């Protein structure tokens, strides 16, 4: 069924992934802002969700995004050492490493969920990261249903 | 009268064209009821399914209706889809359990269309138990390993043939196409008699439990009974008569659906009110409710005990809280006379 | 791997039971505790059941053998008053984590430590013998009369998977130790089972977990049997935000199991209570073991082995591995 959907989408139009991007308020969100102010082009695939700190990202956010049908998830925070709250991203880093490993273990494709550090000064780099992530998710195709809820009732946007 | 399994299988396969046939199959989770296309898929030698066949009539998670709002227009779609079905290989306990579910979902006051449409459109082919599990205690619950109550057609496995009993009109209609019933040999008749007279080894006494429970609401018996319970839903979900559910809305932007999901009295959330008040916030109250509902309230409301002795709750309980021991415990309570 | 100082069954075992009972009697008569949480004989063969002893006349119910598989630490947070708990190695590790997380008051807890040689996994036996009619354990042999066949097993054959890889059979925290202790050779944790799964292709793993998740009925026996799943409101029950719909779709089941495993990251003590509690025999352990392996290899942490070591996710280091970062 998932395969079927996938074929329909790719045959009728080019697949444009929907990517949920959780960005920390102090660095990556500002980086995205800088990319905008500086007019650095990047694909309009991400749906930005601003969080106070990468340490605030609950692992369930990532799972829920995919359950609701996101084709990819991007998570970005301050570079280690630069956290506005001193240690938020250090704590987050441990969580992210475990999440990433577990998701791959249960069979989620590499590249579906991406993590990066982007500072407020890295507008160009933010655009590059989004480009890279978009390319990878596009190559993977739509959410393959490892976590996508098929009949949750009305969540098929 | 009997029919060879070969002939029966041919009719079964032919019926699969018109009916959705639900039968026990062996899958990753053990023996369970699933839709099959051919008799060859049916698991032959099994004690009972791991999960009861009730989920066919009353699914664990069911979309009742869906809706969509566009401008000022709201469209509502009824999600009930029913076709003709056959439930094959239902054990006597589970067939009896369906009669009990009928009392809940179709009574004088209320008829649940989702349950009843499926119920009315399905034929139940019961199958006697040739082997009896040590946790079975149906003989104590006014049925037996070979009782045909609740079945439309009842079969007894004789090795390479089935002894056939047509119980209801529905069963008769289905059997109309089945020819070539032959008489049993003397040996087979003896086998049928043995199977029919079999009793479960495990027994409980429920003769006075309802009256006893009438007076036990405040008994100290409940104070310690629940202690080892983990409050999981394993017993309720494995029970062929448990029927509590929760209805929720799954809404996303301008569309959504109303879904019905199994709920279980063992979970603290079961009775949590919107106000935050929970009338059964303690395990003690929840265990009392479980016993009261099955052995007292249900009897008062519907005239029957809501337990059929299938033993699934005993097998699935992670802490071995055995309902047979709880029944014994209730029987042994000495009531304080005021 | 694990060398025993004493034999399974036999005299040693019965003297352990006697000592447990004597200790329980002493504690109750001295008024040191209100309740002793232990095991009594269950109603099914090869199954012990948790037992709450409050008065000396119930003390003789207490038993100790290879069927005592529940993790009693799960009851420690649910039972009020001062309590004594019979703790195996894994149970004591769970108690350590609970104490570290301030879920228990040390002074209200009396830990009766017993070294454990592993517990029997009934499901393993029943897969072959059918439902067990009768069984006995003697001299390291488990003799089973089943509905399909009769069989004799050595204890090692029917030991639960968690006990096969157990490195802490002796309680790590206890107020009294009963019976002998078990020699464990000093060696690093081995994760052969995880490695085997990791070596499969992503597609194979995906298919495996989808099959496992298709069995899950979301009864939450795993969560409730887990001593460390003590949240007042579990994320699966939360309705604002509503993480899950309550459906039994395999993707949602995986969401639940993966979410649970992530919450147990660096906390899981690998007692295997979740897998044994599962009425549907879902391989929950496969996920927990993976998490344990990652925590161990990345952060050199094993949960609950000492009161002094901080939980892995409560700490960080400037040079933690960053292999998960997106390749640019």
Give the ranges of each region predicted by the language model.
Chain B
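Iron-sulfur-associated redox domains of electron-transfer enzymes in respiratory
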Residues: 1-214, 242
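General structural feature for long, well-ordered alpha-helical segments within catalytic domains
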Residues: 7-11, 235, 261, 322
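Residue-level detector of anion-binding/catalytic polar loops
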Residues: 20, 235, 313
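Ferredoxin-type iron-sulfur electron-transfer modules in oxidoreductases and energy-metabolism complexes
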Residues: 206-227, 245-338
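Extended amphipathic alpha-helical segments enriched in small hydrophobics
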Residues: 226-236
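A donor-sugar binding/catalytic signature common to diverse glycosyltransferases
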Residues: 234-241, 246-250
């Amino acid at each position: 069924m998932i395969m079927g959907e996938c074929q329909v989408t790719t045959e009728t139009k080019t697949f444009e992934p929907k990517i949920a991007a959780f960005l920390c308020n102090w660095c990556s969100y500002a980086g995205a802002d800088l990319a905008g102010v500086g007019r650095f082009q990047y694909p309009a695939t991400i749906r930005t969700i601003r969080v106070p700190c990468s340490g605030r990202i609950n692992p369930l956010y990532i799972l829920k995004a995919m359950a609701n049908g996101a084709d990819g998830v991007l998570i970005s925070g301050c570079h280690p050492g630069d956290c506005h709250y001193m240690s938020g991203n250090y704590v987050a880093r441990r969580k992210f490493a475990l999440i990433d490993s577990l998701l791959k273990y249960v069979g989620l494709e590499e590249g579906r969920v991406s993590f990066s550090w982007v500072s407020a000064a890295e507008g160009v780099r933010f655009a590059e990261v989004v480009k890279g992530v978009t390319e990878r998710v596009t190559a993977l195709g739509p959410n393959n249903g490892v976590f996508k809820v098929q009949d949750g009732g009305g969540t098929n946007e | 009268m009997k029919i060879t399994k070969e002939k029966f299988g041919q009719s079964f396969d032919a019926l699969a064209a018109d009916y959705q046939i639900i039968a026990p199959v062996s899958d990753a989770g053990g023996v369970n009821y699933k839709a099959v296309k051919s008799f060859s898929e049916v698991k032959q030698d099994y004690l009972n399914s791991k999960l009861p066949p009730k989920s066919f009539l009353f699914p664990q998670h069911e979309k009742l209706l869906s809706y969509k709002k566009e401008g000022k227009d709201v469209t509502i779609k009824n999600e009930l889809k029913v076709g003709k079905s056959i439930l094959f290989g239902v054990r006597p306990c589970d067939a009896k359990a369906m009669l009990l579910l009928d009392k809940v979902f179709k009574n004088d006051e209320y008829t649940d269309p989702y349950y009843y449409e499926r119920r009315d459109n399905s034929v139940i082919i019961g199958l006697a138990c040739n082997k009896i599990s040590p946790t079975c205690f149906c003989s104590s619950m006014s049925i037996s390993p070979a009782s045909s109550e609740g079945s439309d057609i009842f079969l007894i496995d004789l090795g390479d043939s089935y002894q056939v009993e047509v119980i209801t009109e529905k069963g008769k209609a289905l059997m109309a196409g089945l020819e070539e019933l032959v008489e049993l040999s003397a040996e087979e008749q003896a086998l049928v008699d043995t199977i029919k007279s079999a009793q479960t080894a495990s027994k409980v006494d429920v003769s006075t439990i309802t009256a006893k429970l009438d007076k036990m609401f405040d008994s100290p018996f409940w104070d310690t009974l629940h202690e080892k319970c983990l409050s999981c839903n394993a017993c309720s979900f494995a029970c062929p008569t448990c029927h509590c559910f929760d209805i929720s809305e799954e809404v996303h932007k301008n569309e959504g659906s109303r879904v019905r999901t199994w709920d279980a009295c063992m979970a603290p959330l079961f009775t949590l009110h919107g106000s935050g008040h929970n009338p059964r916030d303690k395990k003690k109250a929840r265990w009392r409710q479980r016993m009261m509902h099955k052995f007292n309230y249900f009897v008062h409301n519907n005239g029957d005990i809501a337990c059929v002795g299938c033993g699934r709750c005993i097998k699935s309980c992670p802490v071995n809280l055995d309902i047979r021991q709880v029944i014994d415990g209730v029987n042994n309570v000495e009531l304080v006379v005021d | 791997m694990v060398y025993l100082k004493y034999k399974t069954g036999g005299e040693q075992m019965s003297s352990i039971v006697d000592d447990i009972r004597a200790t329980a009697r002493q504690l109750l008569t001295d008024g040191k505790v209100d309740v002793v949480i232990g095991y009594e004989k269950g109603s099914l063969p090869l199954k012990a059941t948790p037992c709450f002893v409050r008065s000396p006349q119930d003390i003789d119910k207490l038993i100790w053998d290879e069927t005592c598989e529940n993790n009693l630490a799960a009851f420690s947070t649910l039972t009020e008053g001062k309590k004594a708990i019979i703790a195996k190695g894994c149970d004591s590790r769970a108690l350590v984590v609970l104490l570290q997380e301030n879920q228990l008051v040390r002074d209200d807890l009396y830990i009766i430590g017993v070294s454990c040689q592993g517990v029997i996994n009934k499901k393993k036996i029943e897969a072959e013998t059918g439902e067990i009619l009768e069984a006995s354990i003697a001299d390291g042999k488990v003799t089973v009369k089943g509905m399909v066949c009769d069989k004799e097993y050595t204890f090692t054959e029917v030991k639960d998977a968690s006990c096969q890889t157990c490195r802490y059979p002796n309680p790590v925290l206890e107020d009294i130790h009963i019976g002998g202790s078990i020699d464990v050779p000093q060696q690093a944790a081995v994760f052969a089972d995880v490695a085997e799964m990791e070596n499969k292709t992503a597609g194979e793993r995906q298919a495996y977990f989808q099959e496992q998740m298709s069995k899950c009925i979301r009864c939450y026996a795993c969560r409730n049997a887990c001593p460390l799943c003590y949240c007042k409101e579990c994320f699966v029950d939360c309705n604002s935000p509503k993480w899950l719909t309550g459906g039994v779709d395999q993707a949602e089941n995986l969401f639940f199991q993966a979410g649970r495993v992530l919450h147990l990251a660096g906390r899981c003590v690998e007692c295997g209570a979740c897998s044994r509690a599962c009425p549907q025999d879902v391989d929950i352990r496969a996920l927990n073991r993976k998490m344990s392996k990652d925590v161990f290899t990345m952060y050199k942490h094993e949960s609950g082995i000492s009161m002094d070591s901080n939980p892995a996710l409560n700490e960080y280091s400037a040079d933690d591995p960053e292999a998960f970062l997106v390749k640019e």
